Design a protein with these regions (language model features):
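Short coil/turn segments at secondary-structure boundaries
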Residues: 193-195, 398-407
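C-terminal structural cap/anchor segments
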Residues: 309-401
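Structured, solvent-exposed acidic/aromatic patches
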Residues: 1-333, 379-381
C-alpha cells in the first residue's frame, strides 16, 4: 500500500488527473475515467493513514525486501512505517495549496495533525539511514540506471571518446543552481559536481605542477580606465550555461550605423572552449546508482515549514523544536547525507543562510537570474530560506525539485510561454 501510494503521488503530481478508480479495468467505447489530482491525493492519504496504523514489526514480513531490508534481508517494518508517515506529511503539505477544494485541504489538515501527534511523531525519519532510496542493479542489459544506459555505457564500451565527456548528454550542474552554490560558498558543491578540466586531460595522468582549471575570457568594466577590457581567468567549476545565446523573445541589438550589423550586445556570452563542464559525480549515474525518493533533510524542512505556517493553516500541533531549529537540522542532515564534514559552521553563519537574514548572490552570465536569499522580515521570508534549502538538498532529484517549485515558485525559474500552444517550459 505504501509503495502504491508513492507511485500514485508521482503520477498525479506529474500529470495531474490520472486513472485510479478505473485503472486496469475494461472500458467500452474508448471511454476512460480519470480521477482529479485532489481525488487521487485524498485516496493516497487514506492509504497511508491505514498503513501507519496497521504496520506491525512483529507481524508478517517480506523475506527478501529490496527497499528496506533488515539485518537478515527481511522487511524492516519500522522503516516502512517511517516512510509511510513521512510521505503522508509531504503529500498533505502539498495539498494545502488546493484552496479551491475545501474537502482536500480539510483532509490534509487532519492528516498533518495525525502524522504529528505524540505517537506518530516517532514514525518520521530520524536519520539518513531512514531515507527512502532505491538502487539500480548491475546487469547492463536489464536493470542498470537510465543515465548509465544512455551515457556511461558508451564510455565503458569504448564506443564514445572520453574527450566527449563535456557533451550535452552528460548531466552537469546548470548555471542557475551554481549561482547559489558559488554565492554562499556551499560546502556541498564538491559533492554535487566535478571540477572542470581541460578536455585533453580527461582520463590522463594529472601533473601536480599544472593548472587544469577552465580558462574564461571575458570583457569586464575597468573603473580606472573607464572602458571594457579583455581579461582571462581560471575557474574551478564551469556550470553548464544555456546553449542558446540569444533567448527566445530577446530583441537583438543592432548597430545604429548599419541595420545589417548586430551590435556588441546582441548576444551575452563569454568564450570558454575545450573544457568540461561541472559534471555530476559518477556515483549519481553509475550502474547501480541510488535514487533518493524522500530524505531526513526534507522531513526537517517540512517540520520547519509547518511551524511557520500552522497558524495560517489552522493546524493544531505542538512540535518540540522551533522552525529555526528544524531549518538548521535540515541543512545539517543534508551535509551528513553527502559526507560533508568541513565548512559547515562557516556556511551557517553567512548572510542568507543564517536564520532570518538576507544574502545577496551573484547572477548568471546574461544577468537574467540572481541568486539572492531574502530570509529577513517575517515568516514568509523565513519560508524562502526553508524552501530554497530544501531545493538545494534534493539536488539531482528532478521530481522533488519540480514538486517544490510547482508548489512554491520559490526558485523563480525562468519560464517561457511557447506560442501558439501556450506551452509552459520551465
Amino acid at each position: 500500500t505504501t509503495w502504491k501510494a508513492y507511485l500514485y503521488s508521482v503520477l498525479t503530481t506529474t500529470w495531474g488527473p490520472v486513472p485510479m478508480d478505473a485503472a486496469c479495468k475494461e472500458t467500452y467505447g474508448n471511454v476512460y475515467y480519470y480521477n482529479s489530482e485532489a481525488e487521487v491525493n485524498m485516496q493516497i492519504l487514506r492509504w497511508l493513514d491505514t498503513a501507519v496504523d496497521i504496520f506491525d514489526p512483529e507481524g508478517e514480513k517480506m523475506l527478501k525486501d529490496p527497499f528496506y531490508p533488515g539485518t537478515g534481508g527481511e522487511s524492516d517494518i519500522e522503516k516502512w512505517r517511517k516512510f509511510a508517515n513521512s510521505l503522508r506529511l509531504d503529500i498533505a503539505i502539498r495539498m494545502m495549496n488546493m484552496k479551491k477544494n475545501p474537502e482536500a485541504t480539510t483532509l490534509a489538515r487532519e492528516q498533518i495533525e495525525k502524522a504529528l501527534n505524540p505517537t506518530n511523531r516517532n514514525y518520521l525519519f530520524t536519520s539518513n539511514d531512514d531515507n527512502a532510496a532505491g538502487r539500480y542493479g548491475t546487469d547492463p542489459n536489464a536493470d542498470v540506471s537510465l543515465y548509465y544506459e544512455r551515457i556511461l555505457k558508451e564510455f565503458d564500451l569504448g564506443t564514445k571518446l572520453e574527450t566527449e565527456l563535456g557533451g550535452l548528454t552528460y548531466p552537469a550542474m546548470n548555471e542557475y543552481f551554481f549561482c547559489y552554490m558559488r554565492s554562499f560558498q556551499d560546502p556541498r558543491l564538491s559533492k554535487y559536481a566535478q571540477q572542470s578540466r581541460n578536455n585533453n586531460t580527461v582520463g590522463a595522468k594529472y601533473e601536480s605542477e599544472k593548472d587544469y582549471r577552465a580558462v574564461v575570457r571575458d570583457s569586464l568594466w575597468s573603473t580606472k580606465e573607464k572602458r571594457f577590457v579583455q581579461v582571462s581567468y581560471r575557474i574551478p567549476y564551469l556550470p553548464r550555461f544555456e546553449m542558446k545565446q540569444t533567448p527566445s523573445g530577446w530583441l537583438t541589438g543592432k548597430d545604429e550605423h548599419n541595420n545589417d550589423l548586430q551590435s556588441l550586445y546582441s548576444t551575452a556570452s563569454v568564450s570558454i572552449e575545450g573544457y568540461t563542464y561541472a559534471l555530476v559525480p559518477r556515483d549519481f549515474i553509475k550502474q547501480d546508482a541510488t535514487i533518493k525518493l524522500l530524505t531526513w533533510a526534507e522531513v526537517n524542512f517540512m517540520l520547519s515549514e509547518i511551524q511557520l505556517r500552522k497558524e495560517e493553516w489552522g493546524i493544531n500541533v505542538a512540535l518540540p523544536q522551533s522552525a529555526e531549529q528544524y531549518y538548521y537540522n535540515g541543512i545539517n542532515a543534508s551535509m551528513n547525507e553527502y559526507g560533508v564534514t568541513t565548512g559547515i559552521s562557516e556556511y551557517l553563519e553567512r548572510d542568507g543562510i543564517k536564520w532570518n537574514t538576507n544574502g545577496l548572490g551573484c547572477h548568471d552570465y546574461r544577468n537574467f537570474y540572481k541568486a539572492d536569499i531574502n530570509g529577513k522580515g517575517g515568516y514568509k521570508n523565513n519560508l524562502q530560506q526553508v524552501w530554497k534549502q530544501r531545493y538545494f538538498a534534493t539536488y539531482f532529484n528532478g521530481y522533488a525539485g519540480w514538486t517544490l517549485e510547482r508548489r512554491t515558485r520559490v526558485m523563480l525559474s525562468l519560464i517561457h510561454i511557447s506560442e501558439p500552444t501556450r506551452r509552459v517550459v520551465i
